[in-house]
From Swiss-Prot:
UniProt binding sites for Fe cation 2: 60, 75, 79, 108, 113
Function: May play a role in the innate immune response of the leech nervous system to bacterial invasion. The oxygen-binding site in each chain contains two iron atoms.
Keyword Iron: yes
Expressing tissues: Expressed in the central nervous system. Detected in the pair of large glia within the ganglionic neuropile, in the six packet glia that surround neuronal somata in each central ganglion, and in the bilateral pair of glia that separate axonal fascicles in the interganglionic connective nerves (at protein level).
Protein family: Belongs to the hemerythrin family.
Name assigned to this protein: Neurohemerythrin
Induction record: Up-regulated after septic shoc.
A Pfam family annotated for this UniProt entry: Hemerythrin
Key word Transport present: yes
GO molecular function: iron ion binding; oxygen carrier activity
Alphabetic keyword roster: Iron, Metal-binding, Oxygen transport, Transport
CDD domains registered for this protein in UniProt: Hemerythrin
Binding site for Fe cation 1: 26, 56, 60, 113
Length: 120
């Protein structure tokens, strides 16, 4: 059972992980997925999403490594799996794939990222 996808699809305080840089990046991820949902045929929107995902995952993983975060391996695997699936997409992106990305981000933040609150 997952968390509810917000409508409109925007970051809100319920997604706060309490690391300002990560919260700002999460806002950017929401915006990138929202932009893709509005322009699924725009290859630039898909490339931008891939870029911000790569940058965010790198920053988040660096913070976890520096903190010797105990669940780093599982968390990184979730990132790798998402990136692999995202890399398989091409424009135009089907609505079900956009919905999948929205759902994944919501559930990843609230179900996985929340586990590192106060530990990084």
């Amino acid at each position: 059972m997952g968390f509810e996808i917000p409508e409109p699809y925007v970051w809100d305080e319920s997604f706060k992980v309490f690391y300002e840089n990560l919260d700002e990046e999460h806002k950017g991820l929401f915006q990138a997925i929202f932009n893709l949902s509005k322009s699924p045929a725009d290859n630039g929107a898909l490339k931008h999403l891939s870029k911000v995902i790569d940058e965010h995952f790198s920053h988040e993983e660096d913070m976890m490594k520096k903190a010797s975060y105990s669940d780093f391996d599982n968390h990184k695997k979730a990132h790798v799996d998402f990136q692999a699936s995202l890399g398989g997409l091409s424009s135009p992106v089907a609505n079900d794939k956009v919905h999948w990305a929205k759902d994944w981000l919501v559930n990843h933040i609230k179900g996985t990222d929340f586990l590192y609150k106060g530990k990084l």
